Amino acid sequence: MRHRKSGRQLNRNSSHRQAMFRNMAGSLVRHEIIKTTLPKAKELRRVVEPLITLAKIDSVANRRLAFARTRDNEIVAKLFNELGPRFASRAGGYTRILKCGFRAGDNAPMAYIELVDRATEPQTEVATAE
């Protein structure tokens, strides 16, 4: 019985899962939107949201904890300089998962995971004929 066992294995051993989510969390912080499979996106949420909560209080201890979890100084800097202040007034729910169909090769359900308040590119207005 698998009572009280949280998280998905995703057909990987624990070190592979840890490395994969460390890399995916870095990509999500860097690009603010990534495309992945739906189960990976749902698990990534459990990794990224605590990092952003940690970044809301800028201290040396919190920066060291964030570095221990991401192993990338560029990501830590963006977390504490941009994302922490941006989400300071939000109590949680920093990410959004949008389903986007199925992968062509194996029909795996795909999804975009993005930060909720990410800066969108300005859309160019199409001139209408009058």
From Swiss-Prot:
This is Large ribosomal subunit protein bL17. The gene is rplQ. It comes from the Bacteria. GO terms for biological process: translation. InterPro entries: Ribosomal_bL17, Ribosomal_bL17_CS, Ribosomal_bL17_sf. Coiled coil: none annotated. GO terms for cellular component: cytosolic large ribosomal subunit. Keywords: Ribonucleoprotein, Ribosomal protein. It comes from Photorhabdus laumondii subsp. laumondii (strain DSM 15139 / CIP 105565 / TT01). SUPFAM superfamilies: Prokaryotic ribosomal protein L17. Part of the 50S ribosomal subunit. Contacts protein L32. The keyword Ligase does not apply. Belongs to the bacterial ribosomal protein bL17 family. One of its GO terms (molecular function) is structural constituent of ribosome. The keyword Coiled coil does not apply.
